[in-house]
């Protein structure tokens, strides 16, 4: 039908659709769509936010159990978790995935040791709440792990940062997350962003990267950050993402206007 989902995509000459998918997702509808012979590309995007969400131990443990079940890897250590995530990363690649996407409040680039991360994993996996410092160290380690995975496969990594979420406690308890009570955050993240990108770049493992800020105050930060890590291997290896969410304004988001900007 003309106004079905597929009909609308054909009507507007869509060539590729990339969905947002968790590492534990089956991707069954991507497989079915491909097998149906649908001419428009339908590709998954790797969104592993829950694998670094260690604020609530019970939620993290429950997610690890899902990851273990879908990957076939028994998880009892940090290395086990990374092995399970790599297996899912491989599966996503087999289904045509070429992009990762990370929804983060800010960039995380704390110093840490392998021993510290192993201990932090054991602590949260065992049900004990982490300190703020431990949370930041774990998130920092996970961003590096994910960045290295993407580089190994030649993927492009995307970072959407700057939202402050679930601000209305009453409505959060009533409706849960992602129900319209998020807003633009204000974070000092330039140094952490630079440190994160620099670590991967120094290791020779910086993947193609797109940076999306939510607070327009960071426009100049990103615009100047891009030039620090271009290496001539491809044009625009590090790019400024288009406006999203509160910045999805028609006067800057139309393709013709984006072409003028570029």
Predicted regions and their residues:
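Extended, charged catalytic domains and RNA/DNA-binding interfaces, predominantly
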Residues: 1-184, 199, 228, 239
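A general structural motif
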Residues: 56, 184-194, 215-222, 246-249
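Short, well-ordered secondary-structure micro-motifs
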Residues: 169, 222-223
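Electropositive, surface-exposed helix/loop patches at the edges of structured domains
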Residues: 192-212
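Glycine-enriched alpha-helix->loop->beta-strand junction motifs that scaffold or abut catalytic
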Residues: 204-206, 229-238
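Extended C-terminal subregions enriched in glycine
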Residues: 209-219, 229-232, 243-247
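Single conserved hydrophobic/aromatic residue that forms the stacking wall/gate
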Residues: 250-262
């Amino acid at each position: 039908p003309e106004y079905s989902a597929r009909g609308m995509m054909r009507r507007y000459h869509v060539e590729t659709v990339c969905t947002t998918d968790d590492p534990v997702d089956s991707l069954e509808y991507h497989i079915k769509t491909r097998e149906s012979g649908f001419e428009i590309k339908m590709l998954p995007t790797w969104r592993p936010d829950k694998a670094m969400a260690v604020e609530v131990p019970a939620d993290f443990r429950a997610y690890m159990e899902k990851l273990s079940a879908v990957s076939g890897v028994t998880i009892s250590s940090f290395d086990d978790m990374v092995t399970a995530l790599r297996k899912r990363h491989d599966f996503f690649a087999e289904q045509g995935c070429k992009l990762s996407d990370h929804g983060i409040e800010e960039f995380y680039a704390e110093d840490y040791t392998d021993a510290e991360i192993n201990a932090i994993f054991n602590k949260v996996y065992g049900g004990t709440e982490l300190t703020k410092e431990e949370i930041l160290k774990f998130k920092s380690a996970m961003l590096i792990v994910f960045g290295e995975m993407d580089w190994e496969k030649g993927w492009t990594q995307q970072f959407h940062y700057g939202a402050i979420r679930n601000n209305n406690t009453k409505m959060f308890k009533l409706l849960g997350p992602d129900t319209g009570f998020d807003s633009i955050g204000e974070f000092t993240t330039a140094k952490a962003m630079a440190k994160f990108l620099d670590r991967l770049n120094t290791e020779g493992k910086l993947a193609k990267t797109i940076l999306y800020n939510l607070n327009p105050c960071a426009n100049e930060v990103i615009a100047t950050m891009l030039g620090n890590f271009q290496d001539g291997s491809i044009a625009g290896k590090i790019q400024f993402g288009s406006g999203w969410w509160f910045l999805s304004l028609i006067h800057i988001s139309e393709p013709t206007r984006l072409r003028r900007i570029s």
